[in-house]
Each structure stands twice: as structure tokens, then as C-alpha cells.
């Protein structure tokens, strides 16, 4: 009788452990899905439209700013989650901005040192990451209320979602506007990355509409339409 009771207890403990493990896995998957698709900063929340529309004239510029944003999001979420218990609620927003500004300054200096041509191309939009609603939004909505590891994963997922949206929009505009993709990628990853540059078609003149700001709005509209169509099909 005692052996049977012990076996039942062991089975119950295994079930509980398995349920907890499955719950943890589902949390990680849900955070990732929120950042990449369900709550994508660019095509769902429509945040950070200023750099999204201004810098996405080429895939290289878009990818560069996307990676910078992802790095800033991950780092700021990490710091804010780590010190969330010590940040006074009354002055949390100025503290968040100070942490974000410090991180952006570090990223800006790194880009100035190692990817100078891209740094010049992105210009004012690197320091403007400080005012990006995505960064402060994740700090307030997630990092200040959740564990360190979950906050790091949220920052990475949201940043990756933003970087993917930027790069896809940049690639779309570059292909239609100039007939190339990843032109100047060596400015971001070095000469060894030149193989990524492709000429889709050759033209004597560029399609200016897609290179200029109107093309950014048209391209973003297309991405929104495609995403909404996919969501409707899934339903």
C-alpha cells in the first residue's frame, strides 16, 4: 500500500513538472510570436514610423538601423528589468529615457568606429532611436514588470520583428526603385559580404517614386495588406 502511494505521488509530481515545463515553453513561444508577427512593432503597432519610412530606401540601410534598434531594445530591457525594483515609480520614465539614451550613444559610437559609411548614411536616425516609441513602450509594458530572461527575450523578439519589417520594406523599395538588393552591404558586414549584392534587373534610370518618401508609404501599405490577408486566411 505504501509503495502504491509513493508511486502515485511520484506520478503526480512528474505531471506537475511536465505541466510547468510546457507552460514555460509556451511563454517563450508566445513572446517570440508577439514580437515577430502578432504584435509586430512596425506592421501591427505602427510604431517608429519616422525611421521606418525615412531609412528604408535600401535593404542595407534598413537592416543596419534594424540591427541597431534590436541591440538597443535587448540591452535596455535587460537593464530595466534588472533594476526594476530599485527604480521609483514616480520618476521611472526619465530614468528609462536616460538608460535608453546611454545605450543608443554606445551603439552610435560603435557604428561610427566600425561601420562609418553606414553611420553617415543613417545620420540623425541613429540618435533618434532614443525617442522611438517601441523602446520606451517595451520598457514600460514588459521589462519593468517581468523577469530578466523573459525581458531579454522580449527585447530581442520585438527588435527582430522590427528589423525584419525594415529589411523587407527596404528590399522591396530597392528592388523596384533601383533593380538591386543589398547594394553596399559591405559597409555593414565588410568586403566578405559582397556576395549578397544582386542586380535583379538593369535599368538606365531609377524608379524614383519608390526611392522617395511616397514609395515608403506605398511599400508599408503593401506589407500591411499582405499581413492582414494572411491573418484573415488563418481565421
From Swiss-Prot:
Please provide one cellular component term from the Gene Ontology annotations of this protein: plasma membrane
Using the chain's own numbering, where are the disulfide bonds?
A: none
Q: Which HAMAP family match?
A: RsxE_RnfE
One Pfam family cited in the UniProt record for this chain: Rnf-Nqr
Put simply, this protein is called Ion-translocating oxidoreductase complex subunit E
List the GO biological process terms.
electron transport chain
**UniProt superkingdom:** Bacteria
* TM spans (from-to): 63-83, 93-113, 117-137, 152-172, 206-226
Key words, A-Z: Cell inner membrane, Cell membrane, Electron transport, Membrane, Translocase, Transmembrane, Transmembrane helix, Transport
> Its gene?
rnfE
Tell me if Cell inner membrane is a UniProt keyword of this record: yes
